[in-house]
């Protein structure tokens, strides 16, 4: 199996068949498990093996198949699937931190991630320093003796900022800290975060892994020691486990993720070229486009630029709303990574609860639009975008 190519792993890794020989992965809709003897029950509670099941909050055969497929494509030692992407983010950070510890985070974060970092962690007595994620000197200067975790998104939501993962990992490790990376926008197909030096990688499986807007889910990947000894003891007692049904849907999503994301990335590149220079667009962002501020870094650590294009319209919120309301094919939605193309206005949706000054500093202006590119015909998408832009 270890010599399989990625697309083969996406279809076959982790699959275990029951005695019935089902072709599709079995869906184990059960909250608990029965034991042949009292001795077997005792043994399972002692061993606590990921392949021996005692309760749905701790593990499930369908969920484990999803975890093992993610392990194979990410190149991780172990993984644990969660109920949502934010459960993955929260659990990955909370299990490593206690009162008096220090966390360094990039300022460029999804709104809910920023709330966890800048609000919840501070309330729990954890020191937090926010830095410009693209500036290695700021990461280095922020390190303290009690720094336990460095946290970043690369690519960031929604400004598509690219951080030097290897550079931040080196700084973190020299100071005895761990690097946690939210890799949702880049996907495991276009950026192998653990190979770049990250200790823990997080995904909202809700996005590209499902890819069709059906289910919520998250997954945390890292070393066996971290997952088994640090993350799982915290997670199984706090409870945000993935449901077996959602895991089954995610397994089906993984079978086609490479086909979808390749098509989405190709569409994104065509859209960038079509929109460049448009009179109503003041700024357009895509990581592997030569105009991107971190272009050289992006092409050094990514194979493709992802599935999201962001741009700023002249005319602020009024222009952004006029543009969104004029779209016909592209749907207004705050989700991303879907087979359908989706557009949103971050200031009034995903980053609404972020302080206005922080939004402006991050480049999330009133005219800013995030476009999650789908798998539709690129010509149709470009026509839809250009026609909507003319109505701004």
Regions found by a protein language model. Name each.
Residues 118-119, 127-129, 141, 145, ...:
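PLP-dependent enzyme catalytic core of the Aspartate aminotransferase-like
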């Amino acid at each position: 199996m270890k010599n399989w190519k990625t697309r083969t792993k996406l279809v076959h890794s982790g699959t275990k068949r029951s005695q019935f020989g089902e072709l599709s992965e079995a869906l184990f809709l059960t909250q608990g498990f029965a034991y042949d003897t009292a001795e077997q029950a005792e043994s399972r509670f002692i061993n606590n093996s990921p392949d021996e099941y005692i309760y749905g909050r701790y593990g499930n055969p369908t969920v484990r198949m999803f975890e093992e497929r993610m392990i194979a494509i990410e190149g991780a030692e172990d993984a644990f699937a969660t109920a949502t992407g934010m459960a993955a983010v929260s659990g990955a950070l909370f299990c490593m931190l206690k009162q008096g510890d220090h966390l360094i985070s990039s300022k460029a974060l999804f709104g809910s991630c920023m709330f966890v970092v800048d609000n919840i962690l501070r309330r729990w007595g954890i020191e937090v320093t926010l830095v410009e994620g693209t500036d290695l000197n700021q990461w280095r200067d922020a390190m303290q003796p009690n720094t336990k975790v460095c946290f970043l998104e690369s690519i960031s939501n929604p400004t598509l900022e690219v951080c030097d993962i290897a550079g931040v990992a080196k700084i973190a490790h020299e100071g005895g800290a761990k690097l946690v990376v939210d890799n949702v926008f880049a996907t495991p197909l276009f950026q192998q975060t653990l190979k770049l030096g990250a200790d823990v990688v997080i995904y909202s499986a809700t996005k590209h892994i499902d890819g069709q807007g059906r289910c919520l889910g998250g997954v945390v990947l890292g070393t066996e020691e971290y997952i088994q000894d640090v993350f799982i003891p915290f997670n199984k007692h706090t409870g945000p486990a993935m449901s077996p049904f959602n895991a089954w849907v995610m397994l089906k999503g993984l079978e086609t993720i490479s086909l979808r994301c390749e098509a989405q990335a190709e569409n994104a590149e065509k859209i960038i070229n079509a929109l460049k220079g448009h009179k109503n667009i003041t700024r357009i962002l895509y990581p592997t486009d030569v105009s991107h501020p971190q272009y050289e870094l992006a092409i050094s650590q990514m194979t493709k630029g992802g599935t999201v294009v962001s741009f700023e319209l002249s005319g602020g919120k009024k222009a952004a709303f006029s543009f969104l309301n004029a779209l016909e094919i592209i749907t207004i939605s705050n989700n991303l990574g879907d087979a359908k193309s989706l557009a949103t206005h971050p200031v009034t949706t995903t980053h609404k609860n972020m302080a206005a000054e922080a939004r402006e500093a991050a480049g999330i202006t009133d005219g800013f639009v995030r476009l999650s590119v789908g798998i539709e015909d690129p010509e149709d998408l470009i026509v839809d975008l250009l026609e909507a832009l003319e109505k701004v």
